[in-house]
Amino acid sequence: DYGIKYGGKLHEFKTEEEFYKFLGMDWIVPEMREDTGEIEAALAHKLPKVIEVKEIRGDIHLHSNYPIEPSHDLGKDSFEEIINKAKSLNYEYVGLSDHSPGVSTHTRNQIVKLIEKRTKKIEQLKSSIKNIRIFNLLEIDILTDGQLSVPKAGLKMLDGAIAGIHSSHSQGKKTITSRLLT
């Protein structure tokens, strides 16, 4: 699989690393192969260092199967399963950031009540699990008018939020940008 004809001779290689070296390049990890200047950087031996899994200290964008009646799909694992996996990876922290409750199926008061119930569960975990930091987060929709899908009373219960546009993607560039900046 790793071969090249050069000077009328077939040069074969056992690894990609050997192949790249033959071409005078540093090996480019697959994650970096995006046609954004990595070939030039490899030829100049100036590729950036890739973060290794052991260097990752945590993850703040994790969706659980907690029944918050979200605007989008639930995750597959429970809070406890997520935390146990994070601990097995030696993470220092996790952010439980499920999608917020759907605005088309809940009143603002119902959204706050669902967040309150979820927050109580996360607070119980925070008090019983001491060797990893747990953040109570939500992924919140930015609505078509630029407002957030979670009322301020719900936001106050969170450690933070991830806000994103999940609907009306066909709006014009100016409108979409305005939604993000509101």
Across the structure, where does each feature detected by a protein language model lie?
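Extended substrate/RNA-proximal surfaces in nucleic-acid metabolism proteins
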Residues: 1-58, 72-77, 81, 87, ...
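Histidine-centered divalent metal-coordination motifs
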Residues: 61-65, 99
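Short connector loops at secondary-structure junctions
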Residues: 96-105
